[in-house]
Every structure is written in C-alpha cells, then in structure tokens.
Amino acid sequence: MVTGGFSNYNYAKTTEVIDLANPNIKCQNMAKLINLREGAVGGLIKQKWPLICGGYPAVDQKNCEVIGGIDEMELKLDLLERRRWAASQVWIDEQLWVTGGIEGPSITSEIVNIVDGKVATSVMLPLYIGDHCLVQVTSDLFLLIGGIGGGLNERNVSDETWWFSIGTFGWSKGPKLNQARRNHACVVFKDLTTNNTVVAVVGGSNSTTSDLLDSVEVFDGQSWKYGPKLPVPLESSKMVSKEFSGVLMGGYDGSFPTSVMRELTCEFGTCFWRKMSQKLQEPRRDFVAMIIPDSLTNCTNES
C-alpha cells in the first residue's frame, strides 16, 4: 500500500494497493488521505488500519489519520507531540516509534502507544537528524542510517549509522557508510540462499541540494559494501520488505517523480535488481509505503 507524497505537480492524496507477487492482480484503491502529506510516517494498527502521521504541509505536521478500508471509512487522530516531516519510523508491538525529522532537524523521538493515543516513551537520538532511515534488524536491535543534521543547527549530510538496543535502551555507533546520503531508502530482508539478514541502503542525495545517487550499499554484518547500482540516480523513494527481497517504489529521478518498481534480491551475498511489471498508478516521491494483509482490499485477477 502506498499513500500521500508529491506527484508531478501536486500533492498526492490517493491510496494505492499493489500486489507484489502477481502483476495480473489489480486491487481497488483504499480511501484518499484527508490531509496533504509529503514526508509523512505510518504503520499498520492491529493488522487492520493504516495509520499516517505528520508530513508537510498536513496542517500542523502533528496530526494523524487512519485510512479506512474500501468502504471509505476514515478516522482522524492527533497523536504526535511534535511537528514532524522527513522523519523515520518503525512499528513495535502496536507502538509507532517516530524519530527525528526536518523540523529542526530534530534530536527527539517519540514512541506512541496506539491503544491509548499517548506517548509511552521518548528516546533522545544521538544527533539532530532528518531525511534518514530507521530499520529493525533483529527483535532487539534497530539501525539509524544517514540523513541530514549533526549538531545543533547543523545541516550536514551524514555517513554515520547508529545502533539502538531495546535491552540497554541506548545508542552505540555503527559502521560508517561509504557514501554520506540523505533521502535514501532502506530495507531489511533475508538472503535467498544463505538466509542471512541483508540490510540495504539505496540511492538518495549526498548534498543539501539535489546531487542524486545511484549507489547501493549492503551491510555484511561488519561493514558496508557497495551493491548493484540503480539504473538511474534516485532519491525520496520507498522500500518495503518481503521475506527474501526488498521492493523499491517511486522516487525522484532529478526531473520528475517516477512510478517504476524494482525488486532487490541477494543470493550467496551477491545482490541484483529486477525491474517489476507492476507500477504505481500515480508517480510519487516522499510517500508512505507499507505491507498490508489481503483482507483489507478487494483484488481481482485480470489475466
């Protein structure tokens, strides 16, 4: 499922559902966003309701909304304590951990309990950061990757990574990227043959303007190694995880948002790209993407 972001000349409010396994299966769109949202965050509540928070302009960049199913049911929520766009998030046991953001950039984060709508815990980040990635690598370990920020009032593109452990509830420095980057996409999946965990960082920009990157970096457990390049430089795309691959969607190629989708797979530590038959209906950048169960939408096989 993808929603929000920026299309060719306007904000995108449509919510598309794409079957990642079969290009012949076409799914009915879900309800449109109530608010315009570029650079928002989101997750799936109880495997049923897609929650979207923050983003620009989105009124005050704090409000959230739940996208209903195909019956157009929608709910408005107000959960975030701070204005956030270009933040990054992970979903942990019905809690949305939202980190950083360009409003600052921010050194704060918040863990929102969806059940009661309250902030359960606030975790200070190791630096002021936005346009970064946050991914869950194991049940205990999370990895914050790249972005723009640094110290207070700094706007440096970062090559740093930081581990966060739930066990110690603290941060520790991870291995540096080969290339400092912001507005990149990140994904975690398993190697098809070895079953090893793959962490991949894709594209982005290495400047405060728009010097786009086509490079890909893959974490081998010790350091970052360059992987297969993108066919074109790309920033502001999104990736979702399948068990043995990562799917790259949309993004900005330096001229326009794109609708192209590509799949990254690794075998025996060697990774490769495959262009998918599926495409986004609406080209977009800086959107929200997530995996949803089949029960949330109505799909038909058109083969």
Regions found by a protein language model. Name each.
Residues 1-303:
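Kelch-like beta-propeller repeat domains
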